[in-house]
C-alpha cells in the first residue's frame, strides 16, 4: 500500500474555536509542526496553511484548511490536485464523537459518520477511500447537545487524555508514512 504524503487536520479557523473539541485535527497537525520545528505558511490558492515535515525518510505535506469544517473538502481537493497526491496517500485527522477522550483509531475508507468535514471531503472526492485518524472527544449523551459539545472546550482531564492520544498517534505515524498501515493500526490500537 502507498505511504502517506499528506496529513490534514480538520477544525474551524478563528480564535474563538482554537481550544474546542472540534479542533482535535488541528491540534494533531499543530503538534507535528511544532515537534519538527517547522512553521505554517498561508497558501491562499489551497485555502490553507501548509507545512512540510520529514518523517520516516519522506517529506510529507501538512495542511490546515482556513475554511470552516463543513467546507474542508475545497482546501483538501486543491492540495491533492496541486501536489498530485492520491486520496489513498492522505490521512485526515478529525474529532470523533463515538470515542471517549483518550481513544484514537486509524481507519481507511468509509462514510462520514455525521462528521461534517468528512461529509464535505467525501462529497467532493466522490468516495471515502482515504485514511482517517479518529480522535475521541466523547459524546454529550443526546444528539440535541452535539453542536454545543463539539464547539465547547474540553475539561482539563479531557485535554490531558486527548493530548496523550495525539502523542500515541504521532508515535505510529512513521509506520503509516512508510506504508505499513496494518503495523500502525496494530500498534496504535493495542492497549498496553
Swiss-Prot record:
Membrane-traversing stretches: none
Broadest EC class? hydrolase
Entry superkingdom: Bacteria
| Keyword tRNA-binding in annotation | yes
- For tRNA, which residues are the binding ones? 17, 68, 70, 116
Subunit details: Monomer.
Q: What does this protein do?
A: Hydrolyzes ribosome-free peptidyl-tRNAs (with 1 or more amino acids incorporated), which drop off the ribosome during protein synthesis, or as a result of ribosome stalling. Catalyzes the release of premature peptidyl moieties from peptidyl-tRNA molecules trapped in stalled 50S ribosomal subunits, and thus maintains levels of free tRNAs and 50S ribosomes.
Q: Per its UniProt record, what HAMAP family does this chain match?
A: Pept_tRNA_hydro_bact (MF_00083)
Q: Which family does it belong to?
A: Belongs to the PTH family.
Q: Mind telling me what this protein is named?
A: Peptidyl-tRNA hydrolase
Organism of origin is Xylella fastidiosa (strain Temecula1 / ATCC 700964)
